[in-house]
């Protein structure tokens, strides 16, 4: 009987190794399919939507394979179905849990487009369309939202950022920057309107009695950072006096503000 040579032994060894790898892979897949199934779905960070709404929007359910879900697809589905969600982070926790961390976008303003009114967040993303006068969604009070004036809009698709008409892109950018700065300073609830019709004369209504004149967009952050202490001083010196707060001369090196009673 012939004895296998080294080359034949090497081929036999390689075959056994390959077979072993295949068996291990199949065992791992089988084990994952049988044991790594979703038993619990936890939702964190939601206040505008119920846990059931987020779970339904995710498309996940108990019994699905934990490792066969696509986190990016799940996140996209949630953001498409629930416009007030700006981000959804999907985490797997062995052996059987999925955690969905939701970040919501608070409503900030209202814009008019094609005879309808749309709710937007501080980044200019459209959250909802207002239907009729008796609008109610997630406890929103329409009168508490900022009216955006002087912006020509080309598209207002729910879940997407506003698109300005050709030539009005700068106005849209001005609005986004102002809203973002207001959100940082926490003053959005105190603002009644923002007028972006003139990029050299940006202004907004504040606390119901003041018109805050920003002028150009330059030094916007500095202007809004000094607004609250400026108003506190004005209230002390001119109680209950409406007027214009001119911040056009505020820069990163000076906080020169003028108040003109009206």
Ranges and model annotations:
Residues 43:
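Extended, alpha-helix-rich binding/interface surfaces that flank or overlap catalytic cores
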Residues 2-32, 36, 53, 57, ...:
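Charged, solvent-exposed interaction patches on well-folded alpha/beta domains
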Residues 71, 75, 81-89, 97-99:
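Extracytoplasmic/periplasmic mature domains of Sec-exported, cell-envelope-associated bacterial proteins
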Residues 49-76, 80:
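Short extracytoplasmic
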